[in-house]
Amino acid sequence: MIMDPYLAEFIGTTTLLLFGAGVVANVNLKNTIAEGQNPWVLITAAWGFAVFVSVFITSQSSGAHLNPAVTLGLAVAGKFSWSLVPGYFCAQLFGAMLGSWLAYITYIDHYRLTKDEEIIRGTFCTGPAVRNLKNNFFSEFIGTFMLVFGVLFLSLIHISEPTRPY
C-alpha cells in the first residue's frame, strides 16, 4: 500500500520506537514477564524485528528513512530533495514521540513500580557508562556514520529480476 511519504515516516518511526522502547521496558522494568530474561538477546532480536517491520511498512512510500540522520545523509549525498527534509524530520520526531509515549502508556504500572531512574531513562535512550564528552561524541558520530553509510550503500544496489536457469 502506497501512502503519503510523511505519513509513512510518521507511522514507521512510531512502530520502530513502540517496539524498541517496548521491549527494553519489558526486559528492564519491575514485575514484567521478561524481567531479567537474557536482555541482550531479546532486546537485539526485538529491535531487529522493529527495524524490519518499520522498513517493510514504509519502504515503498517514503524510502524508510526512519531517522533524521538518514534523511540528512541522503540529502547531503544528493539522493533526496532538500525541500522534503523538514517534513521528514517533523514526521520522524512526532512518530518517535508517539511510539515512546505508547510504550510508556503500555507499561505505565511497571514504570511506577521501578525506582531506579537509570533503568527508566534507559528504556527511552542510551547513555554513556563513562562520561567523556569527546569519546561519547566520537562514539555517536561513528555509529551514525556507519548507519548512514550502510543506507547509502544499500541505495546504490539495483535489485533486478532473478536469473532463470532455463
Task: Briefly describe each language-model feature range.
Residues 1-160, 164:
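Membrane-interface helix-loop junctions and terminal tails of multi-pass membrane proteins
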